[in-house]
């Protein structure tokens, strides 16, 4: 009789443990899908580790996740889990493997970066420095603020836009309205890249705000 009770207890424990593992797995799996959509991750090599302890009987069929002011896309991330009327704070670790950009050769400070300066490699994304570029297109035509060495990951803190217009430069200002266009010459009051807003001062002292086009002209729409 005692032997039967022992086997029965072990059986119940096994079912509970299996159910708990399935719940934890399902939550991690749902988090994986959330991060893939949130960060547009194409990689299949993604793993989410939940660091916040959950109750053993916790289960949520349709959880809703929300990011909490995160500065990082990978590594330790703060999440709000909404399950019906329940709100839970989770600290999770996102591990992912995918492509990112490194310098193919030494890039001297002040260089307008080109495609042949770069190369893509595959590795752990969660161990990269903050703001690392994952796509070449986001980096090409930017200017590096310091020397970048071969095989070094490149971050957004190491580059700036390429200035089409520089501070105090004389620029063509085009004021555009319905069926008319007026052209002036003005002085830029700051540096500016293509499609950026910039303020210019006309000869009469009036200050206008416009958008820089690819010809280094400032377009003011009325």
From Swiss-Prot:
It holds the Pfam family ChapFlgA. Disulfide bonds: none annotated. Its main location: periplasm. The keyword Protease does not apply. Keywords: Bacterial flagellum biogenesis, Periplasm, Signal. Residues 1-24 form the signal peptide. One of its GO terms (cellular component) is periplasmic space. It is found in: Periplasm. One of its GO terms (biological process) is bacterial-type flagellum assembly. CDD domains: SAF_CpaB_FlgA_like. InterPro entries: Flag_basal_body_FlgA_C, Flagellar_FlgA, SAF. PANTHER family: FLAGELLA BASAL BODY P-RING FORMATION PROTEIN FLGA. Involved in the assembly process of the P-ring formation. It may associate with FlgF on the rod constituting a structure essential for the P-ring assembly or may act as a modulator protein for the P-ring assembly. Belongs to the FlgA family. This is Flagella basal body P-ring formation protein FlgA. It comes from Buchnera aphidicola subsp. Schizaphis graminum (strain Sg). The gene is flgA.
């Amino acid at each position: 009789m005692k032997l039967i009770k022992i086997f029965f207890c072990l059986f119940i424990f096994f079912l509970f443990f299996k159910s708990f593992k399935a719940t934890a797995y399902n939550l991690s799996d749902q988090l994986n899908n959330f991060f893939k959509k949130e960060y547009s991750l194409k990689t299949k090599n993604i793993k989410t580790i939940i660091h916040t302890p959950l109750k053993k009987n916790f289960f949520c069929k349709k959880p809703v996740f929300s990011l909490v002011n995160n500065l990082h896309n990978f590594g330790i991330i703060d999440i709000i889990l909404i399950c019906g009327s329940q709100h839970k704070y989770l600290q999770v670790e996102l591990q992912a493997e995918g492509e990112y950009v490194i310098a193919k050769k030494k890039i001297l400070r002040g260089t307008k970066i080109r495609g042949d300066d770069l190369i893509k490699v595959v590795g752990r994304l969660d161990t990269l420095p903050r703001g690392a570029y994952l796509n070449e297109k986001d980096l090409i035509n930017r200017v590096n603020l310091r020397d970048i060495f071969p095989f070094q990951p490149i971050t957004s803190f190491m580059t700036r836009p390429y200035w089409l217009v520089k501070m105090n430069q004389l620029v063509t200002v085009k004021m555009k309205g319905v069926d008319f266009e007026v052209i002036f010459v003005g002085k830029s009051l700051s540096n500016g890249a293509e499609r950026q807003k910039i303020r210019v001062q006309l000869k009469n002292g009036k200050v206008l705000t416009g958008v820089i086009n690819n010809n280094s002209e400032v377009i003011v729409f009325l």
